[in-house]
């Protein structure tokens, strides 16, 4: 019988109560990982933690990624429970739902930046601190970018700006992590079926001004993609991985 190399490995998944985070967490749990589920909605996290695949290997940790102290507590709780962190799926994010550029308030702009950029940095920083200090040293970080890390949608300036910034975080953290055996990569996802993408079925603005529905893909495909990236040995890394609905507007939005 083959030995599962991932059995007993430890992951943190932010935004783990729904959508992409939930799909990734369930894929990891199904493969034998222990998973700390982080997010703001404790009830949603508990539902995932109590799923059949969890088998006592899931921990729900209410977390606000925009608060450095809350992120620090998440990592401390994970290490206290399982002794280490092998994977961070840095997934928590938000958008403004197609708000016109001139109507975005300063508070809304700051909220998106605080979640999608600052929160992601706080998680990367804590992961580095833990992964550098543990034995064996090292681990993997997978940042959730987006097709919007390549090309924008109309009315998405805050979301797109932060997702472009995530690419900068990924490239720099990948470089800085080399000497500590910390592999850093990014998954850029297009049109997975989630609450965030639900408006696609009603039609969304296109670059030419039209309103069109767009094809979607099963979010479980994203979960399996994250699991594949997470399962590589630390001497190999998927730096950038794009997974998208085949017939959606491509990364150039054409």
Tell where the protein language model's regions lie, with residue ranges.
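Conserved glycine-rich cofactor-binding loop
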Residues: 17-19
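Conserved glycine-rich Rossmann-like NAD(P)H-binding loop of the short-chain dehydrogenase/reductase
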Residues: 31-47
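The beta1-alpha1 cofactor-binding region of Rossmann-like NAD(H)/NADP(H)-dependent oxidoreductases
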Residues: 62-74, 106
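Substrate-binding pocket helix/loop in short-chain dehydrogenase/reductase
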Residues: 99-101, 108-110
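Active-site helix of classical SDR
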Residues: 124, 162
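Residue(s) in the substrate-gating loop at a strand-loop-helix junction
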Residues: 146
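C-terminal helical subdomain
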Residues: 186-187, 205-252
């Amino acid at each position: 019988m083959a030995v599962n190399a991932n059995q007993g490995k430890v992951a943190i998944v932010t935004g783990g109560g729904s959508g992409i985070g939930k799909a990734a967490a369930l894929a990891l749990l199904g493969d034998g990982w222990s998973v700390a589920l982080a997010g703001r909605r404790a009830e949603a996290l508990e539902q995932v933690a109590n799923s059949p695949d969890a088998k006592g290997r899931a921990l729900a940790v209410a977390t606000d990624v925009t608060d450095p102290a809350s992120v620090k507590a998440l990592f401390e709780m994970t290490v206290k429970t399982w002794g280490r962190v092998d994977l961070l799926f840095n997934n928590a994010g938000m958008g403004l739902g197609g708000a016109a550029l001139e109507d975005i308030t300063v508070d809304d702009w700051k909220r998106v930046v605080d979640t999608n950029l600052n929160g992601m940095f706080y998680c990367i920083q804590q992961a580095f601190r833990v992964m550098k200090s543990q034995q064996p040293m090292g681990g993997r970080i997978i940042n959730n970018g987006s097709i919007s890390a390549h090309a924008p949608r109309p009315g998405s300036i805050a979301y797109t700006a932060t997702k472009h910034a995530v690419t900068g975080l990924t490239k720099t953290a990948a470089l800085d992590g080399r000497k500590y055996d910390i592999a850093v990569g990014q998954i850029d996802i297009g049109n997975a079926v989630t609450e965030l993408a639900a408006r696609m079925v009603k039609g969304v603005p296109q670059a030419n001004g039209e309103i069109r529905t767009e094809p979607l893909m099963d979010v479980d495909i994203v979960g399996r993609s994250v699991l594949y990236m997470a399962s590589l040995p630390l001497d190999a890394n998927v730096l950038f991985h794009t997974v998208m609905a085949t017939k959606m507007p491509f990364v150039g939005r054409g």
